[in-house]
């Protein structure tokens, strides 16, 4: 196994509550990994630690040639991680005072340091790819939830990141917009983008993932191909969870 992304011994605490309790995970280049499990079990926190939105207490994260130890992380190393990740938030997290185009160019100019004209050209290309070529000048308030989340995904796509992180990308959407967002994620996955997806959409996880990880209590309980996890889970906790979600 050749790890493009390697997570070792990751621990995150909020006060006395240990949310991540020694996570070890490896992602191969182009691998699509879905994380499932009960609410409050640390799935979203894991993604946020990988982008240093939440600061882990222990453990190491390696992406390509950048390795960050939580105990001695430097600003340069953290920036190196962020430059290698694209994050799609469940609540869109768009800038209300920026257009669709402006939301996409923001990361290119601030994280990548691109000049404005180059960032604009990239944003227009991305808007075309996500089916919003005619909405570049629209503000979030004038767009549907599905359109806003597509802009959020486009913002992450624009960075050409080593790893795309999806934190329950459909949970805030009205049912009518879920399909279009899932279709866009499928298209990205078809390009063999390395992806880590937290989702409550079990059928989507079954379809898109090369590997499914079941988490509970801040730990990885079981992982394997979708056919195994959904068809023949080995751990009683995985079996119980899948029975509950139907």
Language-model features, listed with the residues they occupy:
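Exposed loop/turn and edge beta-strand positions of beta-sandwich/beta-sheet ligand-binding modules
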Residues: 1
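C-terminal boundary and immediately downstream tail of ABC-type ATPase nucleotide-binding domains
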Residues: 216-217, 223, 227-246
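ABC family nucleotide-binding domain
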Residues: 4-5, 11-226
